[in-house]
């Protein structure tokens, strides 16, 4: 969880390219987002019972993949009071052995959603054959917006391409994946045949992380020691000879 510093409300947070998987029972959840200006982008949710994610406030949910939920997937406010807004664009949902039902649920008319290009593979037959989710499967009766709310401008890929464009590199994939990440990626590629919820890390077939040997890569050249490799800085217009990692750019980063 992320807590505030007492100086104002949380906001302007992006969580991207992350694997959010295998929350432990009996509270196995992907995440509760109830602040404004939160972006969830190109993440992979696997083997979480619920909240993949649960959204309140004003937020955007773009190009995420969700696999094998049980009681809840994208929860639209949870029938809560207050007015909420979300852009949900280009997301892919694949049901697994836990069942899961519809990808979008928990709404009421106070939840306003701009929903475009969201697809679901519901039949758990081992074959990737999704369909575009119709408005009738956004359970609870949300209010559909005809245009997106103002949010951060993101490159958005078609949902049906995410297995090729996002899945191979999501998470800590360099120099190569650890056991846990390979395990959940393999579950996704089973298209409904593999997966489950766990209550302790040691129940996984490869043991707990403390049992693993460390995998090492080769450190990339970084002349100024600012954590950004020289090659990346040269390609992106920053100075590889100046320690400027903490400099705030004109775009706020």
Model-derived features: where do they sit?
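Short acidic, glycine/proline-rich loop/turn micro-motifs
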Residues: 26, 75, 243-244
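Aromatic-acidic/polar surface patches that form glycan- and anion
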Residues: 8, 81, 221
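Short, flexible, glycine/charge-rich loop motifs used to bind or transfer phosphoryl groups or to couple energy/partner
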Residues: 8, 108, 217-218
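Right-handed parallel beta-helix
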Residues: 1-25, 29-51, 58-71, 84-97, ...
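Non-transmembrane alpha-helical segments in soluble domains
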Residues: 41-42, 185, 229
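Extracellular beta-rich repeat passengers
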Residues: 54-205
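Extracellular calcium-associated, cysteine-rich motifs in secreted modular proteins
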Residues: 204-253
């Amino acid at each position: 969880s992320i807590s505030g510093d007492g100086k104002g409300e949380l906001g302007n947070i992006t969580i991207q390219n992350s694997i959010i998987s295998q929350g432990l029972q009996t509270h196995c959840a992907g995440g509760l987002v109830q602040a404004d200006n939160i972006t969830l982008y190109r993440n992979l949710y696997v083997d979480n019972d619920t909240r993949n994610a649960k959204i309140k406030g004003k937020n955007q949910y773009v190009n995420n993949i969700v696999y094998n939920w049980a009681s809840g997937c994208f929860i639209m406010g949870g029938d809560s009071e207050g007015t909420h807004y979300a852009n949900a664009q280009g997301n892919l949902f694949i049901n697994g052995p836990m069942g899961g039902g519809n990808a979008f649920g928990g709404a009421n008319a106070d939840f306003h959603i701009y929903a475009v290009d969201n697809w679901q593979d519901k039949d758990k037959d081992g074959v990737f054959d999704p369909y575009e989710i119709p408005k009738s499967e956004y359970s609870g009766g949300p209010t559909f917006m005809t245009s997106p709310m103002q949010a951060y401008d993101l490159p958005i890929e078609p949902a049906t391409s995410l297995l090729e464009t996002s899945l191979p590199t999501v998470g800590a994939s360099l120099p190569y994946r650890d056991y846990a990440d390979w395990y959940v990626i393999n579950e996704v590629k089973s298209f409904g045949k593999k997966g489950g919820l766990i209550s302790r890390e040691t129940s996984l077939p490869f043991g707990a992380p403390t049992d693993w040997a460390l995998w090492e890569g080769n450190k990339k050249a970084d002349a100024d020691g600012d954590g950004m490799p020289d090659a990346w800085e040269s390609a992106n217009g920053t100075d590889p000879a100046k320690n400027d990692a903490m400099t705030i750019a004109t775009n706020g980063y």
